Amino acid sequence: MLLLELLLGLIRFLLGAALFSFMNVVAWRLPRDMDPLKGRSVCPQCGHTLGAPDLVPVFSWLFLRGRCRHCGAHIPVRYLLVELLGGVLALGCTWRYGAAYALPGGLFGMGWAALLALAVCGILLSVSLIDAETQTIPDRLNLALAVCGAVSVLLSPADWLPHIIGALCVSVPMFLLCLVIDGAFGGGDIKLMAAAGLFLGWQNTLLAMFFGIVFGGMYGIYLLAAKKAGKKDHFAFGPFLCAGIVIAMLFGGPVLEWYCAFL
């Protein structure tokens, strides 16, 4: 049984790593008006089409020592880190949701809820990378996140109201604040929290916003202290919101229980 669990864990890890590898490609292609679903992956230096042995998550980068097998160009460690993160989050989603809403015959012990959560994590990866590069969040990614939220409501239709409230409880105040303070939040950030709120429900949405503000505030203080930005400069807030969403999704229940007990 232990050997089987280890094998299933490895498969889940590779599934998450493969998804994040693809979403990394999405994050690179979308800002460049390239179709993420068309065309094979190529080496950015020599343009050689990558074969199956070059695309095995994690192991290809390690086996090739971070270099293209054709031209020897260095492959950024970001690719390895993204795939490792995807693997870890796949295990985290399985731990959090298990086989809830199990698939017929099962899928490596993962149910619909765990797979949906992993898909949300993959979308948030692309959102974070694109926002960090361009300070914009593509509408199609927010739409994909909203679809995940709608599916989560369909999986548990009796709990639809907390999800609807979640879509509004943070996004509406963000929008109203923008009416008072020009540029307080980007439009993409507002849509992001509306879509994420539909998936999370209102309690975890508030928690996600809290963590996003804390992380973003700490980064802003660092930029000011290091004199890398002025008081009126803007920076991408999306990555911090995404981090808050993932934390709330995986650990929201225990954190809220601890907070209520503390009160």
Please state what every model-predicted region is.
Residues 23-78, 237:
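Membrane-proximal soluble regions of multi-pass membrane proteins
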Residues 222-247:
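Interfacial loop-to-transmembrane junctions
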Residues 12, 105-109, 113-219, 257-263:
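Functional transmembrane core segments of multi-pass inner-membrane proteins
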Residues 20, 189, 236:
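Short, conserved phosphate/pyrophosphate- and ester-handling motifs at nucleotide-, phospho-/glycolipid
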